[in-house]
């Protein structure tokens, strides 16, 4: 099955502490989670690893967010939108459901 949200798509967060924020998808996991640039930032406590020359401390990093909690952003309407699939010239393409424009 084709993915409705793919890497480098601009998305908007629908629920949670970052609701309403926009960002670019950096990674899509096969279990239905996505990493969005600058969204869902967590603080990890990391131990130092002297063998690798890595210092320990508090590290801020992006955590995965469920794909159902984000929607693709339509730049024409400036709103979140749904994605549909159709065949054009023998190829499967994604399109915005609000205005039928190909993504």
Swiss-Prot record:
InterPro entries: KOW, Rib_uL2_dom2, Ribosomal_uL24, Ribosomal_uL24_CS, Ribosomal_uL24_KOW, Translation_prot_SH3-like_sf. GO terms for molecular function: rRNA binding; structural constituent of ribosome. Keywords: Ribonucleoprotein, Ribosomal protein, RNA-binding, rRNA-binding. GO terms for biological process: translation. Belongs to the universal ribosomal protein uL24 family. One of two assembly initiator proteins, it binds directly to the 5'-end of the 23S rRNA, where it nucleates assembly of the 50S subunit. One of the proteins that surrounds the polypeptide exit tunnel on the outside of the subunit. Part of the 50S ribosomal subunit. This is Large ribosomal subunit protein uL24. It comes from Haemophilus influenzae (strain PittGG). The gene is rplX.
């Amino acid at each position: 099955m084709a993915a409705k949200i793919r890497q480098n798509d601009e998305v908007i967060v629908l629920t949670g502490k970052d609701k309403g924020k926009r960002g670019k998808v950096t990674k899509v996991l096969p279990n239905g989670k996505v990493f969005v640039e600058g969204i869902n930032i967590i603080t990890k406590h990391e131990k130092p690893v002297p063998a690798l020359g890595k210092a320990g401390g508090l590290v801020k990093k992006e955590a995965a967010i469920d794909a159902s909690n984000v929607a693709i952003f339509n730049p024409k309407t400036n709103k979140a939108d749904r994605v549909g699939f159709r065949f054009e010239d023998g190829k499967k393409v994604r399109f915005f459901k609000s205005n039928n424009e190909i993504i």
